[in-house]
Amino acid sequence: MAATPRKERAMGVSVGLIELHHIPLGYETVDAMLKAADVELVRASPSCPGKFLAIVTGGVGAVECACAAAQRTAGRQAVVCRAIDHLDDAVAEALKARPRPDKLESFGSIETRTALSAILAADLVVKASRVRLICIKMAQGIGGK
């Protein structure tokens, strides 16, 4: 039996992510990102002991500009700093979500070592299969995973 074709989704969302080893510098880095480009702040908070995670969304150029500003500000304190272009819209929405699903037929969960790999894995899953992302929870209260 042939698989049902997956619904086409818009793919043009960009996400910028920086993780640092220095919490106060994290806030300074977020300030630089928001001043450098027209991006939306999704998250800016300590993620686990001694680390800080910031995530922004926006157009490709704006997110790349914000990430460049973040890298300049964070310098060697950055664990990872990356602009991820052309994500499925569902991934960006799941990053912002506070889930309260009505009814689930089934449930899947992926655990990753880094926040960046969680976003990349979610994008691959939603582009390759017929799933609905509910949320992406990253690096808070779960040992940085």
Predicted regions, residues:
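Helix N-cap motif at beta-to-alpha junctions
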Residues: 57-63
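A common structural junction motif
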Residues: 37-38, 70-79, 129-130
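Acidic-enriched and Gly/Ser
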Residues: 66-67
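N-terminal structural module
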Residues: 19-38
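A structural signal for small-residue-enriched, beta-sheet-centric alpha/beta enzyme cores
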Residues: 2-22, 42-51, 79-114, 119, ...
